[in-house]
Amino acid sequence: MIRQGYKNNHITIAKALGIIFMVMGHAWTNTYLHDIIYLFHMPLFFFCSGYFFNNEDSFINILKKRINKLYLPYFKWTLLVFLLHNVFYYLHIYNKNFGLTYYSQNYFYIKDFSKYIFNIFIFMNGSETRLLGGFWFIKVLLWTSLITAFFRSIEKKMNATVVLKLLLFISIPLSILCRKYNIGMPIIGSLDIVFMAITFYLLGFYWRKYEPKITYNIYSVLFTLICICAIPYFWKDPSMFVPQNLIIYYYISALIGIFFCFGVSFLLKRYNISLLYYIGNHSFTILALHFFSFKIISLWIIYINHLSLDYLGIFPVIEGCNSAYYIAYTIVGIFIPLFFSFFYRLFVKAVVKSILHIPLICNILKQ
């Protein structure tokens, strides 16, 4: 779920599948399908990001790229949502009946805005806005890539090849240890989720090296599909935030799901489905806007059931509806952000084009 790079390959398709699964997982809450998706959908993104990790880049160069591709988009989206806080309050998206924290319950005055500046923009806790609830991923991916790049710089200075492998192997027990004792660091936050992300990130990096030797076929895809469909019968509500005694099982389940997505992506690549490429290349926009888009369906449910507008404050969706509404949530959660991205780019191009024509128009008027 990195910033759009307009690539057409099986990883782009895997990202498309991942972002579709993410939207479905947020829409189909407390369901069997939700449990299947949460086995692997976030690890898939860390895996895909690690797949493209350039171990020849310098740490400074990677830092610049990460700031440009992760922090700056994060900053722009969170700044917009932050400044529009009181608008969302008037729209009942934030209200006292369904808000879970002070942020999502109250109208903000100057002192309230100032109180959250460091938390949201320095500590990158954009998820507190709720509307950008998925932005915890951006923070974790940023630190994951920087920590990996830092260890790679040490590896290059030592002229060794084992430092990243060592980081991979120690990240697994460290993720368990940090979750058990709730270990964190200033700015970075909880270290357990970061070490889990590093594990999947490095597995993606090494997967790319050995992928030419791996065979994707319909039989392996079907086998992994059966596995991920069977696991939720024995394990309810899995996610990257499972208790420490289940983390090992989660690693295994996530890798099965990742292999399934890569297999499907590899098989679909031959059909050159442009929609999947478009979705995969605009995954960041979908991440940012799908919770906003859900409010369209929630508003319709409120209207036909004569509910209070405060129900717009329920995140991510209004539960207890029939499956048709979950499907509707999924569709708008994917396509409204895509429409926004498409028309926004058309608008920007039109503005740039008009600006470029101003000198020409001035010259014509002078004649």
Question: Where on the chain are the PLM-derived regions?
Answer:
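Alpha-helical transmembrane segments and their immediate juxtamembrane cytosolic regions
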Residues: M1-Q367
